């Protein structure tokens, strides 16, 4: 494939300035300075060409097998990321809008402290969330201040939660334009509308009369309003009509179009997210009507801004349509979708479609890195930067927003600097790619190429989901169909993978062919058959103990069980996230999967010896 390159950065000898990450000033944004910083953030985003982001969550996985690994298809990878995103909370959101001009990288780093505070007393954004002890320990070691997070963290609502919150606030909602119902009116509808029309007519006439000079004293006027049920909405007269159903709401709104010149209908929401009343407000003139609607919209806008909190920044990023650079696309954007957009869909295709509507251009830095250095691991940013030292890629970093610098203790670092490192790594990768091509002259060309070549992770994820191919760039990688994978568990004795392979070779003729063994966690292992056929033979043998003999019969008698890749996919799809994979596979075998979207198409897996679980890390 012809490679298109992204950068107009010039690589001039002797023009390199190296900045230690501890010297980068990252603006820390908390609840106390959030609103006064919003305009500055919007300006930084608008003036930049790219946006780097990095999240710090309260955890990433609850068990070893919950981590995305080489054996996962895009769908199972997404389900694992979805489970983590719904389980753990974002405590820090590092954002770094940046621009590239020649060898100069201009960054605007911010680090937002978040905490899901239930300010509306309605269980949103979250009643509770999970924490991973090792993650919190690491954050404390880095100097993370949990007191600031809890007391000064910025709260937020997702777009879906904001829509729901309108029904929980006490502010009436301006009724939308009415469309006449297509269903025929019943006798009960006709009687109801006639009664309400008469009531509104009398009330409206009293409002008109009260506006003109009459001989009535204040007492008589008050009694008349009391009899007609007239109330005050601010300085304006209003009438509240209680309703029992949304059908009655529709009928009242249709009827009120007869009085649209001087009557404005408002909906009074109930806590059950329905409508409990329609409030009609009398307008003294057309100018008064226009002013009233503007007041309502301003009030709604201010209320929405108050409850959405940090999501205002997410909306800035989305509306800018700038390419977003992420170190870990799947983990970051499942968390962003769950916390700031709405509930995560059940499959990766719907997720990609939903995400692309908000963030159409996403640069997956891990994939970009593998094009330059296929054997590199980008999970550690300093290590990834070091792996590029063999390339001549000078980048000068200039921090544009110098306000609120962070003084770091020795050994401590601000999470906000991760986003700066991501932008710097991206710039270096662009410089390396560009070195093989003629110089691209303009930054506009740079943006266009970025969008074409590397900023379509959302689309490519959806395409890969259809093919169900896992691409793992690692040494000694071999592609294998998911039909040739077998999960085994219930091993009576603890043994290494090499010893288990040796035992299996002596247990059944099927193991005379080439195969491999890897542990997934402490409870289960996976058999990789490099040819088609042996996996079905082995599973058939394990499930028919009477036909077995020798050591394999003894292993089955001691509790050995086996299942194909479809059982693993079913466990992920049905949410059997037990601590041990063996328990999840047992539940999946016992369950009846009636999911119509379940996919039985075989998948291809890239297998790598380097991606085995290291039990020392568990």
From Swiss-Prot:
GO cellular component, one term: nucleus
Subcellular location: Nucleus; Cytoplasm
Enzyme class label: hydrolase
Cofactors: a divalent metal cation
Role according to the record: 3'-exoribonuclease that has a preference for poly(A) tails of mRNAs, thereby efficiently degrading poly(A) tails. Exonucleolytic degradation of the poly(A) tail is often the first step in the decay of eukaryotic mRNAs.
Lineage: Eukaryota, Viridiplantae, Streptophyta, Embryophyta, Tracheophyta
Protein family according to the UniProt entry: Belongs to the CAF1 family.
Coiled coil: none
EC number: 3.1.13.4
Keywords assigned by UniProt, alphabetized: Cytoplasm, Exonuclease, Hydrolase, Metal-binding, mRNA processing, Nuclease, Nucleus, RNA-binding
Keyword Iron part of the UniProt annotation: no
Species annotation: Arabidopsis thaliana
GO aspect biological process, one term: plant organ morphogenesis
Name of this chain's protein: Poly(A)-specific ribonuclease PARN-like
Residue numbers binding a divalent metal cation: 54, 56, 332, 418
GO function terms (MF aspect): cation binding; metal ion binding; poly(A)-specific ribonuclease activity; RNA binding
Superkingdom of origin: Eukaryota
Region (Disordered): 588-607
Catalyses which reaction(s): Exonucleolytic cleavage of poly(A) to 5'-AMP
């Amino acid at each position: 494939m012809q490679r298109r390159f992204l950068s107009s950065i010039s690589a001039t000898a002797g023009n390199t300035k190296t900045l230690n990450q501890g010297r980068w000033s990252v603006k820390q944004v908390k609840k106390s300075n959030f609103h006064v910083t919003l305009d500055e953030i919007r300006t930084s985003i608008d003036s930049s060409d790219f946006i780097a982001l990095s999240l710090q969550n309260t955890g990433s996985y609850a068990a070893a097998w919950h981590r995305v690994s080489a054996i996962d298809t895009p769908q199972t990878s997404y389900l694992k990321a979805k489970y983590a995103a719904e389980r753990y909370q974002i405590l820090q959101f590092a954002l770094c809008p940046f621009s590239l001009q020649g060898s100069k990288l201009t960054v605007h780093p911010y680090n937002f402290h978040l905490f899901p505070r239930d300010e509306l007393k309605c269980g949103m954004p979250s009643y509770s969330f999970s924490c991973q002890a090792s993650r919190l320990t690491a954050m404390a070691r880095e100097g993370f201040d949990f007191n600031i997070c809890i007391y000064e963290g910025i709260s937020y609502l997702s777009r879906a939660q904001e829509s729901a919150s309108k029904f929980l606030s006490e502010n009436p909602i301006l009724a939308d334009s009415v469309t006449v119902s297509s269903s025929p009116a019943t006798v009960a509808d006709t009687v109801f509308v006639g009664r309400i029309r008469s009531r509104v007519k009398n009330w409206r006439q009293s409002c008109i009369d009260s506006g003109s000079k009459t001989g009535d004293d204040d007492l008589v006027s008050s009694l008349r309003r009391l009899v007609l049920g007239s109330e005050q909405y601010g300085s304006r007269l209003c009438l509240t009509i209680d309703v029992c159903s949304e059908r009655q709401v529709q009928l009242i709104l249709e009827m009120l179009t007869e009085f649209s010149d001087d009557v404005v209908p408002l909906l009074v929401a109930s806590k059950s997210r329905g409508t409990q009343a329609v409030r009609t407000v009398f307008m003294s003139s057309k100018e008064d009507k226009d002013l009233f609607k503007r007041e309502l919209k301003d009030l709604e806008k201010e209320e929405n801004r108050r409850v959405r909190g940090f999501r205002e920044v997410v909306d800035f990023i989305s509306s800018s349509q700038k390419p977003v650079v992420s170190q870990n696309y799947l983990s970051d954007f499942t968390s962003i979708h769950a916390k700031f957009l709405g509930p995560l869909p059940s499959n990766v295709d719907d997720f990609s479609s939903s995400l692309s509507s908000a963030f159409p251009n996403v640069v997956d830095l891990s994939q970009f890195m593998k094009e330059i250095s296929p054997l590199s691991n980008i999970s550690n940013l300093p290590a990834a930067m070091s792996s590029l030292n063999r390339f001549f890629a000078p980048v000068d970093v200039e921090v544009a927003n110098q306000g609120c610098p962070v003084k770091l203790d020795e050994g401590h670092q601000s999470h906000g600097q991760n986003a700066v490192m991501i932008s710097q790594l991206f710039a270096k990768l662009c410089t390396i790619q560009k070195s093989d091509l003629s110089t691209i002259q303009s930054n506009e060309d740079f943006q266009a190429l970025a969008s074409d070549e590397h900023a379509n992770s959302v689309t490519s994820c959806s395409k890969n989901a259809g093919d169900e191919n896992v691409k793992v760039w690692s040494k000694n990688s071999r592609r294998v169909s998911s039909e040739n994978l077998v999960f085994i568990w219930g091993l009576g004795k603890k043994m290494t993978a090499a010893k288990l392979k040796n035992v299996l070779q002596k247990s059944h003729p099927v193991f005379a062919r080439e195969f491999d063994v890897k542990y997934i966690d402490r409870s289960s292992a996976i058999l990789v058959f490099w040819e088609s056929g042996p996996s079905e033979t082995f599973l058939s043998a394990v499930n028919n103990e009477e036909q077995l003999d020798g050591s394999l019969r003894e292993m089955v008698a001691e509790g050995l069980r086996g299942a194909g890749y479809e059982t693993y996919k079913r466990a992920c799809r049905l949410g059997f996230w037990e601590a041990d994979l063996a328990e999840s596979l047992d539940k999946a075998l016992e369950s009846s999967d009636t999911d119509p979207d379940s996919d039985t198409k075989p998948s291809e897996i890239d297998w790598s010896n380097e991606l085995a679980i290291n039990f020392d890390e568990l």
